């Protein structure tokens, strides 16, 4: 495809909650392809537990969530939905910096209504569980929330 400008738009639709536009295009020779227009988000700094700062990395968060919850989520799409929801919540704060603790809390909020085992697994990594009592405490907390 030499020049995207020669193509015509066949279909347009909003995706990612209005944060992007997906366009189906057709080249003069009849070939079809898809383009995406995304809103560029401002840089977001993460303040780590050590006090150091680094840029928010969606891929890093996705890998951390996938690793910690194992196979307890139904699909990669479910992990992606969690990461998107967390990212949206972070940008909705309107701050240029966010703590790693806030990110972990947002992930726990998303996992809480998706999969209880994934929630406990992530909590054990995020909150650095060291004893069985740590597990018992989080399980009792989740049970009280579920019953109440």
Briefly describe each language-model feature range:
Residues 5-12, 36-39:
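Short Cys/His-rich "knuckle" micro-motifs
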Residues 1-3, 26-27:
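Short cysteine-rich clusters marking metal-coordination/redox-active sites
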Residues 12-22:
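Short linker/helix segments within small regulatory modules
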């Amino acid at each position: 495809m030499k020049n995207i400008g020669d193509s015509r738009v066949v279909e347009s639709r909003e995706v990612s909650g209005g944060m992007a536009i997906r366009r189906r295009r057709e080249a003069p020779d009849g070939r079809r392809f898809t383009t995406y227009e995304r809103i560029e988000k401002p840089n977001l700094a993460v303040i780590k537990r050590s006090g150091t700062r680094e840029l928010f990395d969606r891929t890093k968060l996705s890998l951390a969530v996938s690793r910690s919850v194992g196979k307890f989520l139904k699909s990669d799409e479910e992990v992606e939905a969690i990461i998107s929801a967390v990212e949206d919540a972070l940008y909705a704060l309107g701050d240029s910096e966010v703590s790693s603790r806030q990110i972990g809390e947002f992930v726990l909020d998303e996992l809480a209504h998706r999969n209880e085992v994934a929630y406990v697994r992530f909590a054990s990594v995020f909150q650095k569980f060291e004893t069985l009592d740590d597990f018992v405490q989080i399980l009792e907390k989740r049970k009280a929330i579920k019953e109440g």
